[in-house]
């Protein structure tokens, strides 16, 4: 599965969600297009061409993670975000770096499985409906008690068996009627008893998350749960709920997990994107103290980025063609502080700019998922048509920029805290007030946020 989008189209798609940062968008668009170009080459040349990994440099909240995440969604590529600070050098307490590849494969399996389930959705629903009819019209089987073996072998059909045949015919007619009612949606609220498989918990939870288990690439909990017999539990639920449970069970039976696993590994190897955040936190110059461990983390990451084979519970995974995007603010350190070998593995460097007032204005109104649109939609559920005036939007953007400059610069995330504070009273009272339309004006913004923004000490705690 490879995207046929051109770099220009990729940038246009990213523009729907992310404001500015054209340099970063162009770099990731070219990296993605090169993957498509690589698939068109003959196998010998294809193996030689590896992705050009990207290093994004810029403060928090300017769109580094969002660019990578949206890029992965565009092409249905497996994507994970990890933080470099969570890893430690081999021998220290903490996650080993190979776990990022295992997490990527898990993400890939989940992605492929969801796609396969979607393909068999209609068939699974039909099978679920058949099972529902069986639950709604249970069989009328009668046990015949024989006095001796000869009676069982040589007994003739009697009147009771003829009656059973009539009952079976009546039951078939009833099933047809029930099927029709089920199709019309007349039985959705009726209650049925469904037998569901119960998850095995208990002592197996002890095996979760052990660093040693991660290094073995094995999931002990899953292994033990497969050894334990599956428990069945009866649950009463409505037909509507039961259809969902039964359809899920039937879908699991219809998909071939071996095929899913194989496809997931291929997709992780060829299309996978690993986003390593806070890479600057493991960069250090000195050879003493914590920096020794930091350099150890870099040296452990190096073979993964260079290309190696990692053993996972689904099989061996090669990392040669996985795209790595590293990101960091680099306030205290510089990219040159990374070990030279790792620097060489991230040939494309992109600097993301801090956000200006105009950027904040665009972020508030332009993207498809803009914050103002989200809050307007939320209050619409209470019957209130809320709108932000252009002056109010610019005022919010100005305050966000000022607070970022005076306190910690957290980029666009500042808008979340500002809008939450701005609409706090309105969100609380919305269910009780009767307003059809409401406009958020510049004066209202000044009244709610002006004093906090001006008071530097207070803004550090509230905003």
UniProtKB/Swiss-Prot annotation:
Coiled coil: none annotated. One of its GO terms (cellular component) is HslUV protease complex. It is found in: Cytoplasm. GO terms for molecular function: ATP binding; ATP hydrolysis activity; peptidase activity; proteasome-activating activity. SMART domains: AAA, ClpB_D2-small. The keyword Cytoplasm applies. The keyword Cytoplasm applies. GO terms for biological process: protein unfolding; proteolysis involved in protein catabolic process. Pfam families: AAA (PF00004), AAA_2 (PF07724). SUPFAM superfamilies: P-loop containing nucleoside triphosphate hydrolases. Keywords: ATP-binding, Chaperone, Cytoplasm, Nucleotide-binding. It comes from the Bacteria. InterPro entries: AAA+_ATPase, ATP-dep_Clp_protease_ClpX, ATPase_AAA_core, Clp_ATPase_C, HslU, P-loop_NTPase. Its main location: cytoplasm. A double ring-shaped homohexamer of HslV is capped on each side by a ring-shaped HslU homohexamer. The assembly of the HslU/HslV complex is dependent on binding of ATP. Belongs to the ClpX chaperone family. HslU subfamily. This is ATP-dependent protease ATPase subunit HslU. It comes from Shouchella clausii (strain KSM-K16) (Alkalihalobacillus clausii). The gene is hslU.
């Amino acid at each position: 599965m490879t995207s046929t989008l051109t770099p220009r189209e990729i940038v246009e798609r990213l523009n729907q969600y992310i404001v500015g940062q054209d340099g970063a968008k162009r770099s990731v668009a070219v990296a993605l297009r090169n993957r498509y170009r690589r698939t068109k080459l003959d196998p010998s040349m294809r193996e030689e061409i590896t992705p050009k990994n990207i290093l994004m440099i810029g403060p928090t909240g300017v769109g580094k993670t969002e660019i990578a995440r949206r890029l992965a969604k565009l092409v249905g590529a497996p994507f994970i975000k990890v933080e470099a600070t969570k890893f430690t050098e081999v021998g220290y307490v903490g996650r080993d770096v190979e776990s990022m590849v295992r997490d990527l494969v898990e993400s890939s399996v989940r992605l492929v499985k969801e796609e396969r389930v979607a393909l068999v959705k209609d068939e699974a629903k039909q099978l679920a409906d058949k099972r529902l009819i069986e639950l709604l019209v249970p069989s009328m089987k009668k046990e015949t008690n024989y006095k001796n073996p000869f009676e069982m072998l040589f007994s003739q059909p009697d009147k009771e068996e003829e009656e059973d045949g009539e009952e079976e015919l009546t039951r078939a007619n009833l099933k047809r009627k029930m099927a029709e009612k089920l199709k019309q949606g007349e039985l959705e609220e009726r209650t049925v008893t469904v037998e569901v498989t119960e998850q095995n918990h208990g002592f197996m939870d002890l095996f979760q998350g052990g660093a040693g288990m991660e290094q073995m690439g094995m999931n002990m909990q899953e292994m033990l749960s497969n050894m334990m017999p599956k428990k069945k539990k009866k649950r009463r639920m409505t037909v509507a709920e039961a259809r969902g449970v039964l359809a899920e069970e039937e879908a699991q039976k219809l998909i071939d997990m071996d095929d899913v696993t194989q496809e997931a590994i291929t997709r992780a190897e060829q299309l996978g994107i690993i986003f390593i955040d806070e890479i600057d936190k493991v960069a250090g110059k000195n050879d003493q103290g914590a920096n020794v461990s930091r350099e150890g983390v870099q040296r452990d990451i190096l073979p993964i980025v260079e290309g190696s084979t990692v053993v996972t519970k689904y099989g061996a995974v090669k990392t040669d063609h996985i795209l790595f995007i590293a990101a960091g603010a680099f306030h205290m350190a510089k990219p040159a502080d990374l070990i030279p070998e790792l620097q060489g593995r991230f040939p494309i460097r992109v600097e993301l700019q801090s956000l200006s007032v105009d950027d904040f204005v665009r972020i508030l109104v332009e993207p498809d998922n803009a914050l103002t649109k989200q809050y307007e939609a939320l209050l619409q559920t209470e019957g209130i048509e809320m709108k932000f005036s252009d002056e109010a939007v610019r005022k919010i953007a100005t305050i966000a920029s000022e607070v970022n400059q005076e306190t910690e610069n957290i980029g666009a995330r500042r808008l979340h805290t500002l809008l939450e504070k701005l609409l706090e009273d309105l969100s609380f009272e919305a269910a009780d007030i009767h307003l059809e339309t409401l406009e958020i004006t510049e004066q209202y913004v000044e009244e709610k946020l002006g004093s906090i923004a001006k008071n530097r000490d207070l803004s550090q705690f509230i905003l």
